[in-house]
């Protein structure tokens, strides 16, 4: 839920990047951090394992401007992609205002994408939410590498399996140099 602080005239929204392991969630935040003016961003916080895998979450605070006299702040989070961190995924989703699902475009990742979207549905349900109640962006990542599935095929597969039945206007994404 968007947090309003009328004392400081700030509005803060929580956006969560969700998806399977190694799909590029953390890379997205690194890229945004790199491309955002230093005076509009806070420090990026990453809790990673020794092999650079997200252990708990990544957090990137941004200031994006003023709306209606309120300073708008975004808190961008990632969830760990590994299934055994599901409790952490649920914790990070608590209070979510928007979700960016980062799907890996590689042929070998199709099942992992569908499984992760299904897991997102389950975790939202445990929080009393449905995906169609939360602003949702479906981002197809890694479009610049070989052995990728056409976006239309991935979208059709996800609709057929009812994990993203309302998904429209997919957002293909390439992060030059991997974003780091």
Give the location of each predicted region.
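Conserved catalytic network of the ASCE P-loop NTPase/AAA+ motor domain
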Residues: 8, 52-55, 65-70, 90-95, ...
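Structural beta-sheet core signal
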Residues: 17, 101, 138-140
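Conserved Switch II/interswitch segment of TRAFAC-class P-loop GTPases
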Residues: 79-82, 95-118, 126-131, 143-148
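Canonical P-loop GTPase G-domain recognition
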Residues: 137, 144-180
């Amino acid at each position: 839920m968007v947090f309003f602080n009328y004392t400081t005239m700030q509005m803060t929204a929580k956006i969560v990047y969700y998806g399977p392991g190694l799909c590029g969630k953390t890379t997205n935040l690194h890229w945004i951090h790199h491309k955002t003016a230093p005076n509009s961003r806070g420090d990026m916080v990453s809790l990673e394992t020794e092999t650079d895998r997200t252990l708990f979450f990544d957090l990137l605070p941004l200031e994006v401007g003023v709306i209606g006299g309120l300073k708008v702040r975004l808190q961008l989070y990632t969830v760990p992609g590994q299934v055994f961190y599901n409790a952490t995924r649920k914790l990070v989703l608590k209070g979510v205002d928007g979700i960016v699902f980062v799907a890996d475009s590689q042929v070998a990742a199709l099942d992992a994408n569908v499984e992760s979207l299904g897991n997102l549905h389950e975790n939202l349900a445990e929080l009393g939410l449905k995906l169609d109640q939360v602003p949702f962006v479906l981002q197809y990542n890694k479009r610049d590498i070989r052995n990728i599935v056409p976006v239309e095929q991935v979208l059709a597969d996800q609709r057929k399996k009812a994990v993203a039945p309302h998904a429209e206007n997919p957002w293909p994404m390439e992060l030059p140099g991997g974003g780091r």
